[in-house]
Amino acid sequence: MFQNNMKQRMNWEDFYGPNLGYALELYDQYAEDPDSIDPDLKDMFDELGAPPSQIKEASGTKEQGRVTADLIQKIAAAVKLAEDIRTYGHLNASVNPLRKDPKKSELFPLSDYGLTEEEMKAIPASVICKDAPANITNGLEAIQHLRNTYKRTISFEFDHVHDFEERAWITKMVESGELFRKNSPEKLSAVLERLTEVEGFEQFLHRTFVGQKRFSIEGLDALVPVLDDIIAQSVKAGTTNVNIGMAHRGRLNVLAHVLGKPYEIIFSEFQHAPNKDLVPSEGSTGISYGWTGDVKYHLGADRQLQDAETKSARITLANNPSHLEFINPIVEGSTRAAQETRTQKGYPVQDETKSLAILIHGDAAFPGEGIVAETLNLSSLKGYQVGGAIHIIANNMIGFTTESDESRSTKYASDLAKGYEIPIVHVNADDPEACLSAVKFAVEYRKRFNKDFLIDLIGYRRYGHNEMDEPSTTQPMLYDAVRKHPTVKRIFAEKLVSEGLISEEKAQNIETAVTKRIEDAYKKVPAKKEDAVREIELPEPVSNGFPDVDTAIDFDVLRKLNGELINWPESFNVFGKLKRILERRAKAFDDDRKVEWSLAESLAFASILKDGTPIRLTGQDSERGTFAQRNLVLHDSETGEEFVALHHLDDCAASFTVHNSPLSEGSVLGFEYGYNVYSPETLVMWEAQYGDFANAAQVYFDQFISAGRAKWGQKSGLVMLLPHGYEGQGPEHSSGRVERFLQLAAENNWTVANLTSAAQYFHILRRQAKMLLREEIRPLVIMTPKSLLRNPNTVSEVQELSESRFKPVYEQSGLSHAYEKVTRVVLSSGKVSIDISDHFNKMEGDKDWLHIARIEQLYPFPAKDTKELFAKLPNLQEIVWVQEEPQNMGAWSYISPYLSEIAPKGVNVQYIGRRRRSSPAEGDPTVHKKEQERIVSDSLTRKN
């Protein structure tokens, strides 16, 4: 990549006199045959291009050029040397605090490039380093300046950044000395005080709570002042929201010093009895607990920060499990939500300056966890970009007991970021001033280019993976060096004293004051006492569940909404076949009064928007729909221009977002969860391409969506649409694994539904939207249809939208009301219910012995409605649960205890479906069809 920078530094005006004459002679040779000259010269002329005419006229003779025939080659070699220093200088940098002399031999000797000091002195400094400080007067001084710049305790990698403007800006920041301006004594003193707090807090925990896990920050103490400075600079520039994601290493220290969580609360958590009375009453720090709670080093917090210039900002450390790196897209989703205004129709209005994402990674986890690459891939996508996240690798050079050469195949932990053209700074965590330079670089780069930036903060881990672990058993040499190594607080204090910036007395006074604050806080913690074991109780709104809400929409309002949905500009050319499909939707309110699935969805969206609730829908192919059913974004067949009818509703003051997502489940679902947590008033929806692929995001279902409220008090109303149904498409396109969601279902933690009618879908979406800001809110998982999208048995009468509501139990239409004759009730959920309905409608003869109902809401189980159904059937003998999934999958294992509990005395509960299998579905469509027919037939066949 050195040619780009050479072009930045050299042009034809840099040559004059004999040198210019020789350069022109060489260029003529290059023009005749580019391969006939030295490769470095060829690269140079490739970039310089043809000389301007006035240059040729001003040149000397060829004879003059031959006087210094090799000078131009020396210049090319010098430029190559300079570029090599920029590209590879990091290899000679002092960024490892435990290794003081990283390279015994100097890289980039002049002799390797065929150069001497005298020759370098003859070259202008501007040819080598355009941005060098004014005191650099020649090429030799310029090269030495570059060597010193790129081999400090901070080093740089940006050769992978291809944008010329970015590279030029980065180069100027580094080489001009802009990054390395001296900090004021006051700021350095404040950094020392912060490092003293960081160390003092850890050492107090180490002495007081012996052997308890805390995942100490020691060895990477500088992380805290780094965060302080990122936040301070960002808030000063206008940021009003900062979202931080990090794992457990150093988390308690960040909570205490960056989030302002009082020491006494953290100490009380070590007593295994968090004292919620200790939470600050003024509300500057928000700390929430769920009813089952979590360990102290997973908890997050909110802080309302006010700086000296009266600028305020909300700082959030996201709640996080021990699943490393999975918090990343959640933080970015929250950041995007904080950046957007959603109180107008159309797409939200994004202001990237309003919110900042800071993601703290582990050196083993950053290259090791695939979710990192998934999240980095979001960084430039219009539906997900956040104007640049600042990444910090908290690099202690070890993962539990695993060395770096065992945990990654790259030189640096940060190398993955190169694929996304993210500038990288490696910095020694024992040099706080270098760390502040890295912060300045990151903040200024993001401000200018709205892109990600990475700081590789290289330190060490003073203790084992946790405080009960002895690291010397596996890394004896490393931990011998660590034990002998002074702390960064001590190193920095001695440096400031030696430079006369503070006195020894002041350094000691800082330490004394910090120790007193910590000890005073500990005195506030009540004495530990053994409380009686108590039953964990759910908050009343959670326990009570959803109240009945009115979700019907007046017929005339629906008709008007429908008209707006098919109202595109006259000049807009809708694709012919699609146009006919959309125009048929008008008949739903004129002729047949029938609403199919996709129209019901669009009407639900339109009515929710009219109610003032913003909507965000993303997923693979979600604009059109995997099954070409949705078509929310129309494309002009002649110009490609887009039109979204939901952006043009009359009297609407809520935004509508729909984006096709990248081919990722984990990062996208995590992003939408984070967006929803930050923006609880928005109906946020994620759609899987097929429900089968949702398990690629299983961590988010298990650790966050199903359990986040119980662990952290973190509410969510996220909607997940998982296409599900057995249609002979094999084991990868049949099952959304409903059994997994039902296994996780407890404590009213989410709604799991498997729907069979357009009206049911309409009402459940509207119900979810109406519940968003209420305490009862919970996530919604819907097993959505595929072939049923166009099945006439799933269409609904318009009247069902305008007069009805969501029905957890949905009775088959066309049944006899001779309830006393019924001996079998067939219960099912989802697509198999439609198969049963089709077969039932074709049956001849006596059918009064059968009653059929669909359990549309699987969880929370509608016990009351189901019990009332059974009560209508006085002679009931059999309750049959029918499913198309294998017996060890689907809803059977979950629902059979519920049915047995409420079944009338003496009535058996039976199973009809596929037998237990390891794979969810058959691969052969013929075998599938035969098995499906058996299941349906058995469910509707009377026993002899």
UniProtKB/Swiss-Prot annotation:
<protein>
    <recommendedName>
        <fullName>2-oxoglutarate dehydrogenase E1 component</fullName>
        <ecNumber>1.2.4.2</ecNumber>
    </recommendedName>
</protein>
<dbReference type="GO" id="GO:0005829">
    <property type="term" value="C:cytosol"/>
</dbReference>
<comment type="function">
    <text>E1 component of the 2-oxoglutarate dehydrogenase (OGDH) complex which catalyzes the decarboxylation of 2-oxoglutarate, the first step in the conversion of 2-oxoglutarate to succinyl-CoA and CO(2).</text>
</comment>
<dbReference type="GO" id="GO:0045252">
    <property type="term" value="C:oxoglutarate dehydrogenase complex"/>
</dbReference>
<dbReference type="InterPro" id="IPR011603">
    <property type="entry name" value="2oxoglutarate_DH_E1"/>
</dbReference>
<dbReference type="InterPro" id="IPR005475">
    <property type="entry name" value="Transketolase-like_Pyr-bd"/>
</dbReference>
<dbReference type="InterPro" id="IPR031717">
    <property type="entry name" value="ODO-1/KGD_C"/>
</dbReference>
<dbReference type="InterPro" id="IPR029061">
    <property type="entry name" value="THDP-binding"/>
</dbReference>
<keyword id="KW-0786">Thiamine pyrophosphate</keyword>
<dbReference type="GO" id="GO:0006096">
    <property type="term" value="P:glycolytic process"/>
</dbReference>
<dbReference type="InterPro" id="IPR042179">
    <property type="entry name" value="KGD_C_sf"/>
</dbReference>
<feature type="compositionally biased region" description="Basic and acidic residues">
    <location>
        <begin position="925"/>
        <end position="936"/>
    </location>
</feature>
<keyword id="KW-0324">Glycolysis</keyword>
<keyword id="KW-0560">Oxidoreductase</keyword>
<comment type="similarity">
    <text>Belongs to the alpha-ketoglutarate dehydrogenase family.</text>
</comment>
<feature type="region of interest" description="Disordered">
    <location>
        <begin position="915"/>
        <end position="944"/>
    </location>
</feature>
<dbReference type="InterPro" id="IPR023784">
    <property type="entry name" value="2oxoglutarate_DH_E1_bac"/>
</dbReference>
<dbReference type="Pfam" id="PF02779">
    <property type="entry name" value="Transket_pyr"/>
</dbReference>
<dbReference type="GO" id="GO:0006099">
    <property type="term" value="P:tricarboxylic acid cycle"/>
</dbReference>
<dbReference type="GO" id="GO:0004591">
    <property type="term" value="F:oxoglutarate dehydrogenase (succinyl-transferring) activity"/>
</dbReference>
<comment type="subunit">
    <text>Homodimer. Part of the 2-oxoglutarate dehydrogenase (OGDH) complex composed of E1 (2-oxoglutarate dehydrogenase), E2 (dihydrolipoamide succinyltransferase) and E3 (dihydrolipoamide dehydrogenase); the complex contains multiple copies of the three enzymatic components (E1, E2 and E3).</text>
</comment>
<dbReference type="Pfam" id="PF00676">
    <property type="entry name" value="E1_dh"/>
</dbReference>
<dbReference type="GO" id="GO:0030976">
    <property type="term" value="F:thiamine pyrophosphate binding"/>
</dbReference>
<dbReference type="InterPro" id="IPR001017">
    <property type="entry name" value="DH_E1"/>
</dbReference>
<dbReference type="Pfam" id="PF16870">
    <property type="entry name" value="OxoGdeHyase_C"/>
</dbReference>
